[in-house]
Amino acid sequence: MNKNFSSMIDRYKHQQLRIGLVSPQQISAWATKILPNGEIVGEVKKPYTFLYKTNKPEKDGLFCERIFGPIKSGICACGNYRVIGDEKEEPKFCEQCGVEFVDSRIRRYRMGCIKLACPVTHVWYLKRLPSYIANILDKPIKELEGLVYCDFYFARPITKKPTFLRLRGLLKYEIQSWKSSIPLFFTTQGFDTFRNREISTGAGAIREQLADLDLKISLENSLLEWKYLGEEERIGNEWEDRKAGRRKGFLVRRMELVKHFIRTNIEPEWMVLSLLPVLPPELRPIIQIDGGKLMSSDINELYRRVIYRNNTLTDLLTTSRSTPGELVMCQEKLVQEAVDTLLDNGIRGQPMRDGHNKVYKSFSDIIEGKEGRFRETLLGKRVDYSGRSVIVVGPSLSLHRCGLPRKIAIELFQPFVIRDLIRQHLASNIGVAKSKIREKEPIIWEILQEVMRGHPVLLNRAPTLHRLGIQAFQPVLVEGHVLCLHPLVCKGFNADFDGDQMAVHVPLSLEAQAEARLLMFSHMNLLSPAIGDPISVPTQDMLIGLYVLTSDNRRDICTNRYTKCNIQTLQTKSSDSSNSKSKNWYKNRPFFCNSYDAIGAYRQKQINLESPLWLRWRLDRRVITSSETPIEVHYESRGTFSEIYGHFLIVRSLKKKILFIYLRTTVGHISLYREIEEAIQGFSRAWSSDT
């Protein structure tokens, strides 16, 4: 990379990019360069691309190797070769063809320029709304368009000099006396002398007015007029009042524009071009397709059109002494229209089309819109190794894991799988490895799991409004076609499971993988970076699930609070529990010795999720409230008795010793308790291993 480009844009030093007007001197500095023999190159003079017979770039053409660099690294147009970066190799360029021995990647950023034979107005600043040229000059856009396209003349304010015409202000070219007589009075050079002395038209007239503009005085005058209109009382005429309001709004916009020019040290006359930059060749390529046919970027054809017309105008101004002035003005208008088409095709009406009636893509078409260079390539990049699918809940996943469908996973990690197949001598080359992947051999999934075990992925949900909109996860293979996600991470993505889609990206570089593991994993982003509140909290589906899980049937409280049968007889230890009476009681008023029996009964559909049941609990007096008195006491024939409370039941012996404690609960409560207990035990194990 050359030093000029490195100083202009350096991704490590510059974190932002500003687009604005540039001076002709800066355009010349970007485009021109001095060869070691002292020759200055950079100006594109010919509208040709490649020579037909040799298939080499035309000298001083749109793909000239002297201007933009060699097509092949270290090889000049003559075919000579030099080692790039070897200081012992002399000379650094070919003395015969003038091509430098540098890397061919220089053709991606080295620019050229076209020296225009007449000034040309930048159509973005003239025709786009708002028209910056019309705003800063405080003139109607129709009047300025008439000047630019040679439909009007502008009489120069000459004083103390004899004039051919005693005229001032704006003159319409369509007046018969001007159109038929004045240009015919002069030859080409004579008409140029007359025009340069007394009248002005074309973009040159606009440039002169912009150059004569004093920005500070314009700002002061606009401010004074705005204050005057603000202090002026309304006259009661609605049309006049609206006109004054529109004028005040225009003055505000004009003052903001002038302040921007002053603040950024930009000269207004830079909106009129005298040098036209030429894009690097790699950004407007010519590609050879099957059959030997060539496909060229539309920009090349638009550049050729500009160069053709500009060269014709140059010939008229320099070689032809007897050319009528009217023909010169017509040619200047054609140059202006060609540059307009290059910058924004169709902005002045019907767009330019090729032989197949297809509209040419101009600069504006390339950079604007959703598929333009900025939104598609620079801002919303479509990257390789990425996929997209609908998200569903993965209840068995850990917080830092996501379920990746096999079809998406094999596409994302295909290069890594191919590499491991070749390393393990399971495939001799890339073609054989791809055939194994297409056939989905069992070994493929084993290697894929090994690759995924050491490679995180990034999940992103648009719009990415904050940094938690993209997080890292450890992928696991799942069946189906959808992404599985832990529900607790949904709040950071502002996602739910009603059809939302997420994009999957694979970090390739070591820096990206390290950042994903150390900073972007979901279990490391539990707090909101904005306010510090927990971000991984139950939402929507989880809240509904927790409510259903912990709800119970309050209507059956009294019937399940006690039983007339002998509790000890009804325990699973008793051999008589298999009789029909015991089975009938177990079905209607269930008692369980442990949580596994309760969940087993639920799975066998003997009880419902919210059905009240009695679960034997460990002898823990913390469940007993000292102030609570039993609702009922049942005495059994063997001397034991049961104390029934609101939410628990105590079985005591004859000596009032606690034999059993039963808690009134549901299968939903039991399931939630077991999940919480497992989570606490897992956290304790992780904490003890870290310490």
Swiss-Prot record:
GO terms (BP aspect): DNA-templated transcription
Record localization: Plastid
Top-tier EC class: transferase
Gene Ontology terms: cellular component: DNA-directed RNA polymerase complex; mitochondrion; plastid
Catalyzed reactions per annotation: RNA(n) + a ribonucleoside 5'-triphosphate = RNA(n+1) + diphosphate
Enzyme Commission code(s) on record: 2.7.7.6
Location (main, coarse): plastid
Record carries keyword Transcription: yes
Keyword rRNA-binding: no
Keywords on record: DNA-directed RNA polymerase, Nucleotidyltransferase, Plastid, Transcription, Transferase
Pfam family membership, one: RNA_pol_Rpb1_2
A GO molecular-function annotation: DNA binding
Subunit structure of this chain's protein: In plastids the minimal PEP RNA polymerase catalytic core is composed of four subunits: alpha, beta, beta', and beta''. When a (nuclear-encoded) sigma factor is associated with the core the holoenzyme is formed, which can initiate transcription.
HAMAP family xrefs: RNApol_bact_RpoC1
Family as reported in the entry's similarity comment: Belongs to the RNA polymerase beta' chain family. RpoC1 subfamily.
Protein's job: DNA-dependent RNA polymerase catalyzes the transcription of DNA into RNA using the four ribonucleoside triphosphates as substrates.
Protein name: DNA-directed RNA polymerase subunit beta'
Organism (species): Cuscuta reflexa (Southern Asian dodder)
Gene: rpoC1
